[in-house]
Amino acid sequence: MQSPPDPANSSMHSQDPHPPRRQGRMNSKDITPVLKGWDYEPGTINVRKITGTDGRPKLQMRLDLGLLQMEMSGRPDGTTPHGCESLLDYYEARLDEHRRINGTDLGFHLTPEQCQSLREEAVMYYHRYISLFVLEEYSGVVRDTARNLRLLDLCSQFAEEEHDRLVLEQYRPYLIMMNVRARASIAYKNKQYAKALEAIQEG
């Protein structure tokens, strides 16, 4: 991770002899109008659903210095790494191919760099599933928590370094809890009370 700039190495001029000219289109990138009327509330998960310029629904999470915007499905940042829905899908496909060719998992490994990229991707899905939980869109919570649990399984089994095999395990109980709460909430909303209780007991 790149270190933040040192303020001591910065310079500020009280009078710039050649001040930059303002350009109209620069103002269009200012997110102040987007944040107006939507104050950040410390200790609260502030989220909302909006319609993007592409006509599709998107999630926004308010932060102290701005916001996060996420796609409702697929990878939250809207990218398709290596042509796949996510990095997890890409490495799972590589594992399947390795098994097909070799008939075994032996020899398949994830490097520290690959594990780091997977962890960064997992954070994106974390932001989305807690946003969806606040909005009571529980099916998306089930989907994303189950997906991150698959990621934990992949890293714990195939990471080259012990650190990468263990570092995410601290989050497994929380992921399971959120998955159970979401499944139980779906059943409860559908008045399937026995199924809601069953989901809790299974968790």
Segments (PLM) and residue ranges:
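N-terminal alpha-helical interaction modules that lie
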Residues: 20-155, 201-202
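Acidic, Ser/Thr-rich low-complexity linear motifs
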Residues: 107-112, 157-174
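Structured, non-catalytic alpha/beta "coupling" segments that mediate domain-domain communication
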Residues: 192-203
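Alpha-helical protein-protein interaction scaffolds
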Residues: 181-187
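Cationic, low-complexity basic patches in intrinsically disordered or flexible, solvent-exposed regions
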Residues: 3
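Acidic, Ala/Val/Gly-enriched low-complexity intrinsically disordered segments
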Residues: 6-8, 16
